[in-house]
């Protein structure tokens, strides 16, 4: 079969099946950018695809659609070996920035739409009564810290093996890694189901209100229907993202979120088929399974199938390299989730006003974090693809641009929060005590968000570089050996209250931002390419 050699890799690459409707790319724009900017890097790499590779169709290097860069003098300067600092004012720098923003935007919208599903549930059940509202909030928190955050940590391994495999042209390896991820997610459903089935006793042990625990236990048992769907959706979403396909998930959620609102009304409030409190988790389960079904149809019929080589028994073997990325990814993500939940729990000890204020501040911080998370996801895909392609110069530039973009977003949001500190809280509540308390603390939270946005992007870069272990270790030490102890001491021993809690958690975030940013920027890029090659061989 005829084919051509890729100038980046010097070896045959498999052909991708081209879709008639292109939301992503037949060849990722991330790699077209690389091909147009970098002089050929001759290197031999053994093909690790399970099947005999077929030639890949390569679009012209001068194609500027979907973010590909034009051939310019600035691009040539990168290829000729100029440092990244010397190119920061070049057209290539701004093209890189535009590309990241373009692909971060749908990820941000996706995160906000997914968050909207939770808001819909809380809003719907909140009108049934305060016990139902408390039970829904407690259930959502429990589901997040015992399952959903773990799923996100596991699928984050695709940020490394998926992006690098796709960047190297080993497209079907992405599908193989996806199958391994799905197998792991399936296995951990069983211990999670056991915890959820016995959750009432666990919550009572933690001294929660007995009536709230009873409602939460019923809610969690119904949510067992939604748990596999959430895991599948996260895996499929990441499967598309590592291919540079970002928009379809946003479009799908834009369709199913209104459906979720309708189902909440139908199952919770409708006089014909509504059955009250338990109607909300049923609506969540149906919404998630519907989203999965549409996403699978999109992949098989429109775009994304090019990285799916079919089911293989190889997916049941050689989980070691994947687990070595997934475990620190879980620690990296769950450490942050759990730390914030513990701080929220501690604020409840201070009183109702403090708990309500913490809720406002945490929600504000989450909204800010979602913006940075979009940049982190795009940066992980971008850098991982470029490492897989052997394009270290452009990977270095993308890293610098990503860090600067994350910090800039944090600064902009900090300024907005500072200027609206006396009015922002009225979006959530009109309680004067809560408004006054939030107004005194939100300048501190605004400053913390600068570091939080930066560390979020740096964490994404570490995942794209395959260095999750650094993030896992740094997050655990910063939050649990420094941040939380300091927060508890300042809050309860020195009576600094909510201010002390945020100083403690802010100190942890500042350390994480500094260490992870330094690590993501100071990299032996050639060594990362060698590690990627080694992972291909192991897989």
Swiss-Prot record:
GO terms for molecular function: antiporter activity; transmembrane transporter activity; xenobiotic transmembrane transporter activity. Pfam families: MatE (PF01554). One of its GO terms (biological process) is xenobiotic detoxification by transmembrane export across the plasma membrane. The chain crosses the membrane at residues 103-123, 141-161, 184-204, 244-264, 277-299, 325-345, 360-380, 399-419, 434-454, 470-490, 496-516. InterPro entries: MATE_euk, MATE_fam. Residues 34-63 are annotated as: Disordered. It is a multi-pass membrane protein. It is found in: Vacuole membrane. Keywords: Membrane, Transmembrane, Transmembrane helix, Vacuole. One of its GO terms (cellular component) is membrane. Belongs to the multi antimicrobial extrusion (MATE) (TC 2.A.66.1) family. This is Uncharacterized transporter C4B3.13. The lineage of its organism: Eukaryota, Fungi, Dikarya, Ascomycota, Taphrinomycotina.
């Amino acid at each position: 079969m005829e084919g051509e050699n890729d100038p980046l890799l010097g070896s045959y690459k498999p052909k991708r099946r081209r879709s008639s409707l292109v939301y992503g790319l037949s060849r990722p724009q991330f790699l077209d950018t690389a091909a147009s900017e970098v002089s050929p890097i001759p290197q031999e790499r053994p093909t690790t695809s399970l099947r005999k590779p077929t030639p890949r169709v390569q679009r012209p290097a001068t194609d500027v659609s979907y973010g590909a860069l034009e051939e310019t003098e600035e691009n040539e300067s990168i290829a000729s070996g100029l440092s990244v600092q010397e190119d920061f004012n070049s057209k290539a720098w701004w093209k890189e920035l535009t590309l990241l923003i373009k692909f971060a935007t749908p990820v941000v919208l996706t995160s906000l739409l997914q968050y909207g599903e939770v808001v819909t549930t809380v809003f719907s059940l909140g009108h049934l009564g305060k016990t139902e509202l408390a039970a829904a909030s407690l259930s959502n928190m429990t589901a997040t810290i015992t399952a959903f955050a773990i799923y996100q940590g596991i699928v984050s391994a695709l940020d490394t093996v998926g992006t690098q495999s796709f960047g190297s042209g080993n497209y079907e390896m992405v599908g193989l890694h996806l199958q391994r991820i799905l197998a792991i997610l399936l296995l951990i459903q069983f211990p999670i189901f056991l915890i959820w089935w016995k959750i009432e006793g666990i919550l009572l042990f933690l001294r929660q209100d007995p009536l709230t625990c009873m409602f939460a236990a019923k809610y969690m048992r119904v949510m067992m229907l939604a748990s596999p769907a959430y895991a599948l959706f996260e895996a499929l979403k990441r499967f598309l993202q590592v291919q540079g396909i970002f928009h379809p998930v946003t479009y799908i959620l834009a369709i199913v979120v209104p459906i979720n609102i309708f189902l909440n009304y139908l199952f919770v409030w409708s006089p014909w088929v509504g059955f009250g409190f338990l109607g909300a988790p049923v609506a969540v389960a149906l919404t998630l399974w519907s989203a999965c079904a549409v996403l699978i149809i999109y992949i098989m019929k429109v775009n994304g199938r090019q990285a799916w080589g079919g089911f293989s028994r190889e997916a049941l073997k050689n989980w070691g390299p994947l687990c070595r990325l997934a475990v620190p990814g879980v620690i990296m993500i769950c450490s942050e989730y759990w730390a914030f939940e513990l701080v929220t729990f501690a604020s409840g000890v201070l009183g109702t006003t403090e708990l309500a204020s913490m809720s406002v501040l945490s929600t504000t911080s989450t909204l800010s974090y979602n913006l940075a998370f979009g940049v982190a996801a795009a940066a992980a895909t971008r850098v991982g693809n470029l490492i897989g392609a052997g394009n270290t110069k452009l990977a270095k530039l993308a890293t610098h641009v990503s860090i600067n973009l994350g910090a800039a977003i944090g600064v902009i949001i900090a300024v907005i929060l500072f200027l609206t500190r006396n009015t922002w809280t009225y979006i959530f509540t009109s309680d004067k005590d809560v408004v006054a308390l939030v107004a005194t603390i939100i300048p501190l939270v605004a400053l913390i968000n600068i570091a939080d946005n930066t560390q979020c992007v740096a964490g994404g870069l570490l995942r794209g570089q395959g260095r999750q272990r650094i993030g896992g270790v740094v997050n655990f030490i910063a939050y649990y050996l420094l941040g939380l102890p300091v927060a508890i001491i300042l809050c309860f021993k020195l009576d600094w209250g909510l201010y002390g809690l945020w100083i403690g958690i802010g100190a942890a975030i500042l350390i994480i931002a500094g260490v992870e940013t330094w690590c993501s920027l100071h990299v032996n890029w050639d060594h990362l390419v060698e590690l990627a090659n080694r992972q291909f061989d192991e897989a």
